């Protein structure tokens, strides 16, 4: 039976976006949506609005029921010019920082950006623990490829890497082969049972200046996007878990 969920939202004000009805914003889907469909909804970003991610979070909850022993964690390692010194996935930061000692500094930074109509991006780290072995396909449906696709579908996500990430560009083969941890829990596109580590890069919101002051525009989406990231990982891992289980169903004699 299909699962239906109704979410009522009264916390919206469409008139905040009236000034965008006749203009395109760089870095948004305004122009490309109109080019594709011949029309667009300018209110709050229309189909490309971050509000659509609520359905992903709801779906992620149901996916997590299939994976009761898998632990999904995420946190902000970089926000604008601020780099967290620690990588603590048990951080108590209300902003989602991996190092809660930077909370006050980040709050002050975001408030100053909000007042100036400025914005910033950053980096998020993800850890998936207790992922079953053998998930993913060897060629076209590699686990890292499907995770990358699902995570890059989140608005403003501009890059995804696994394990040592960008460090692979300068690591020698002899350095890489010493430890399978370098690959972040995925080898040859298939999970090896170790913790999966993912790095994501998010761009700054493109609406700045006076436009950012008039509508409902966040100076940074990172604190809000963490549940969405974890949900997309849950959905992808659940898909591959069910797929792998289908391979192991015993054929009748």
Regions found by a protein language model. Give the residues of each.
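Alpha-helical support elements that line or immediately flank enzyme active sites
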Residues: 51-74, 145-149, 189, 194-202, ...
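Glycine-rich anion/phosphate-binding loop at the beta-strand->alpha-helix junction
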Residues: 117-212
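Glycine-rich, mobile lid/loop segments that gate access to catalytic sites or pores
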Residues: 35-139
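Internal helix-turn-beta structural module
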Residues: 197-253
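Flexible, glycine/charged-enriched surface loops at secondary-structure junctions
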Residues: 69-76, 113-124, 156-167, 244-253
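Short acidic, glycine/tyrosine-flanked loop/strand segments centered on an H-E-D-like triad
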Residues: 21-47, 209-217, 221
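Alpha/propeptide regions of enzymes that mature by internal proteolysis
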Residues: 53, 109, 146-148, 156, ...
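Glycine-rich, N-terminal phosphate-binding loop and its surrounding beta-alpha-beta segment
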Residues: 1-32
